[in-house]
Amino acid sequence: MEINMKKTLLLLSLFLFSLPSFAGQFVQIKNVEVHYSAFNSTFLTPKVARAYQLKRSGYTALINISVLDISQAGKPAISAQVSGTAKNLLGQTKTLTFREIKEKNAIYYIAELPITNEETFRFDIDVSSGKKGAGKLKFNQKFYVEE
């Protein structure tokens, strides 16, 4: 029980740490809200990175997606299929591999992306939660290497 509480707190800190700069970044697709953030993995504590087997490096960004069902009270998190690509300004495309992380009532889809300093990416993310909603999420993000 104590281990689950620690994991919950670690995951909560992962999600909350991404919020200050990116609060309110979401799109509505039919009956779901798709929340997204992208940030340097050094924002994670070493403990959180280890707990979820995430690479913590100044040259690695994390893309965090969560899907909420707005047709239900309290907007609960729901499972979805998430895939996508990131294209830099040189036209180099990288396929994003999202990993689902479930913890209590929260569901996160996390992908790692190698970055260089001041690199800008155009993200093209496909999200499908069945009949609740399916569609594309597009956004740009500039990253800075943290050493």
Describe the residue ranges of each PLM region.
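Sec-dependent N-terminal signal peptides
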Residues: 8-17
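Positively charged n-region of N-terminal signal peptides that target proteins for export
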Residues: 1-8
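N-terminal signal peptide c-region/cleavage motif recognized by signal peptidases
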Residues: 18-22
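Extracellular Ig-like/FN3 beta-sandwich strand-entry sites
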Residues: 60, 79, 118-122
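Mid-chain, structured segments of secreted extracytoplasmic proteins
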Residues: 63-106
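Short, solvent-exposed, Trp/other aromatic-anchored flexible loops in extracytoplasmic proteins
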Residues: 99-122
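Beta-strand-rich domain onsets/edges
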Residues: 25-62, 144
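Short acidic/polar inter-strand loop motif in beta-rich domains
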Residues: 129-136
